[in-house]
Amino acid sequence: MPMPKERKFEWALKPTSSVSWGQVKNKSGQICVVLEHSLLRGVTSDMIAWWFRNFANLKVTLEDVEGYEGEKVPAYWLWHPSDHINAQFVGKLGENGTARAGAKIRIKETMQYNKYGFQFPVNQELEIFYCEKDGWGMGKRIPFFGKMIFLRISYKDVYEDGKIIGVHYHYEVVAGTNKQNIMAKAINKKLVGGFTAEFWEAWITHNTIEVGVFENFLPVLYSQRNDLNSLSYSKNMNPITQGMALQEQKGYDQNLLEERLKGYELSTNAFEYQQGAMKSILG
């Protein structure tokens, strides 16, 4: 997977201290991860839902980004300045080739490329199980075992004095089968073996940056949604400034994080507890 050169957007990237997360193994040996991002400021859930439906199809002209001046590139490259390579919607798509439940997405990226290179690559085709205004869910099934991994994102607008001040963004991942035969246990053991401390450090860093930069580029692209063939981005469009105390931000709902981790730990089938193809747990 050739890696495109880094995009120097000059954004202040959120640190991992701005998220709260935890990991448990349930009674069936499934790995369950819950992650609470800090409040996404200047963003709405409508913007995020629009992005998930469209992002793999979008191209954007980078007007003044060093090394990319005037170049039209995948909008997927804005979603992370160094780790993203390519994304493509395939299968039974919605209107104008948009994502919907039942379609698939092909993803090529790598976790924390600047530190680990291609040590933690992603080159997968995943099924989209949920694509609605309140969230996104995708995963992988294998014959005889069913779901093997499921990533579920939930988001909800947060109001103050009747106005939206940001988005609560909640992420859950389940990996492994709940089945208990010899083959299933061997599969789970292999999966768990790949989830090293280095892997989690790379994934959490990648995900913190990926979600955090919604504040930097998403309002700009969403404002141009009526002309998707002429999307553009320049550095003076950044709505978030350097001085907004990134280091002081924390995961939005610690109680929800702990509640979900406990639920997963007590579960015998984490996919049933996750309810990844149902409405958002945020209500």
Where are these regions (language model features)?
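Short, surface-exposed loop and linker segments with low hydrophobicity and enrichment for Pro/Ser/Thr
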Residues: 99, 129-132, 153-168
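Hydrophobic ligand-binding cavity/cleft-lining segments
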Residues: 2-93
